[in-house]
Amino acid sequence: MSSTVIKYHEPMTRWQPDARGRLEQAAMELYLERGFGQTTVAQIAERAGVTERTFFRYFADKREMLFAGSEHLKQLMVDAVAGAPPAATPLEAVGAALDAVGTVFVDLDHSRTRQTVIDSDSSLQERELIKRDRLATAIAEALRARGIGEPAASLAAQAGVGVFHVAFVTWIAPGNARSYADIARELLVELRDVSRPR
């Protein structure tokens, strides 16, 4: 009985885990190196070691890579508003939502890099504004579901998203060492102080 020896001229590629994470890392690197507008999906996929088809399994387009967590964040905040104590004021319910955000905003370096990319492209800045507007709408709906009327629900939601944004900008600022949650709580107190009569 003879045996057959098979020789491979090319090394066989082994499946690598975490395609999504590798795509996100490759995209960030390329956006910083070449600019968002000059980076293609093909380049991102190649750098990540996957096909373009794999890219589109995870992301609708290259812009959405930067906002992939938006729906999760929105749901987290809406759930926190809904779960706030029944006697909570609208701003206290919004405060619960901001506390919830503090549990996901922990990777400061990634957040700084992501914001650098967004700040470099006007279409990404526009997308970010749209996402914040949708967040405010969702929070207002959650407040209305708690029995908060208008305009109080929309005012509290817009104020909360304002605190959310200012806290984020403060958190990613060079030299900051405080957590997002601590900054957001401090700003919410400042917001309450601003609205009190002097």
Question: Where do the language-model regions lie?
Answer:
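C-terminal peripheral helix-coil segments that are non-catalytic and often amphipathic
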Residues: M1-K7, R144, N176-R198
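Basic, helix-initiating cap at the start of DNA-binding domains
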Residues: M1-R34, Q38-V50, F67, L76
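Residue-level detection of the helix-turn-helix DNA-binding "recognition helix"
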Residues: E46, A60-D61
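Short hydrophobic/aromatic patch on the recognition helix
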Residues: T51-F59
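A secondary-structure capping/hinge motif
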Residues: R63-M65
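Hydrophobic alpha-helical connector segments
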Residues: Q75-R114, S120
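Hydrophobic alpha-helical bundle segments that form small-molecule/ligand-binding pockets
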Residues: D107, D133-A157
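Hydrophobic/aromatic-rich alpha-helical bundle segments in the mid-to-C-terminal region
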Residues: R146-V189
